[in-house]
Amino acid sequence: TAPGRVSLFARSSGTTSERSKYLPVTDVSLWRCHTRGLRDVATLYVGQYPSTRVFEGKTLTLGGTCSKSGGIVVGDLSALLVERTPFWSGWFRTPRRETALLADFDEKVERICRECASERVTAFAGVPSWNLALLRRMVEYTGRRNLCEVWPHLELFAHGGVGFEPYRAAFRELIPSAEMHYMETYNASEGFFAIADDASRDDMLLMLDYGTYYEFRDGDEVVPLEGVQAGRRYAMLISSCNGLWRYELGDVVEFTSTDPYRIRVAGRTRQFINAFGEEVVMENAERAVTVAAEATGAVVSEYTAGPRYMTLHGRGAHEWIVEFGRAPESFDAFVQKLDGELMRLNSDYEAKRRSTMAPPEMHVVPAGTFARWMLRRGKNKVPRLANDRRVLEDVLATTAGQDAAVGVRG
């Protein structure tokens, strides 16, 4: 337990759980961990780009929402940070606090468009999926061709929460500028853990002085930080100044270096498909989607996948739901490339595809489907993989009444 009275709780829906978790955010963790992480992001960015002019404008943050009762504040971590930041932070960030904390997402987006279209925005931060929806609406609202015409001084997106690779092409299309930089952070409701400190690398520096004690699980064995090995993957456990003790985050990290300690997030401990012995993990899926999109000229906005179970007369398969920002030249070619890349990456999948599994099926859903699903379910992330059909069927239910816009390819 944390000493003293805890008045802030971060609501974390995770990706696969139906129940929200309420995580304590102590004053110590708020300033020693979360706020310090934000300061270090700025410091490390300046270290990489000394000629930056990012501080000559404002940072746009698309926060969540929070509620108050009996002196207790509960909400998304982003909302708690907005709620507790001092008044002078408004000199550096946008939109106004009242707008940032609005509960209705569509109303929030419209107000941000009105308030921020004429601001000098030099950076934005947050989860890629929600920011992509906002920025696309900003381009529509202003009637411009892309975001560079709206905010010509824009240079930084500090992103976290989900893997960025599936969104990279969409952001590059929206912000066609060689001066735009993308900086990954590993921050969550539970704490702030790592920052990308070198743009030439695809990993992050593990932050060791934020009030968090790290342990790592490899199967049944748990090792301290000094016991990890480069190239190995571990489930991460933390004990921290917010009162969490040996708490398993559900993330799988891979160490790329032990001097200094560098990691990349390789996936989730519970996000996989293994209905037929194929053992497909999130990293396989993200890579396959990226390759298929590049090969067919597509931009993928969101996706999720799960099993279609075997029947008496039919083979099992993987079923994908995909929302495109730009449709592929050929849907069939996209599915074939996706399938082929999964077979190349995963020998278990290849073996099953050549025997007991049918080719994958793909549902193409209208733009905004996943955003509506997340709002309805109170989630901030789309689960990429699930070993059952609950997410698949729930997302497809969101398209009710729009069946003409939904296709199945296989």
Please state what every model-predicted region is.
Residues 77-410:
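Active-site glycine/GP-rich loop and adjacent strand/helix microenvironment
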Residues 19, 55-57, 153-154, 180:
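Short coil/turn connectors at secondary-structure junctions
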Residues 2-4, 53-57, 354:
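Short coil/turn segments at secondary-structure boundaries
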Residues 1-11:
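Conserved pre-ATP/AMP-binding loop-to-beta segment of ANL
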Residues 23-24, 136:
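Short, solvent-exposed loop/turn and secondary-structure capping segments
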Residues 25-48:
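Conserved structural elements of the adenylate-forming
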Residues 9-23:
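Conserved adenylation A10 loop of the ANL superfamily
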Residues 41-89, 99:
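Conserved AMP-binding loop of ANL adenylate-forming enzymes
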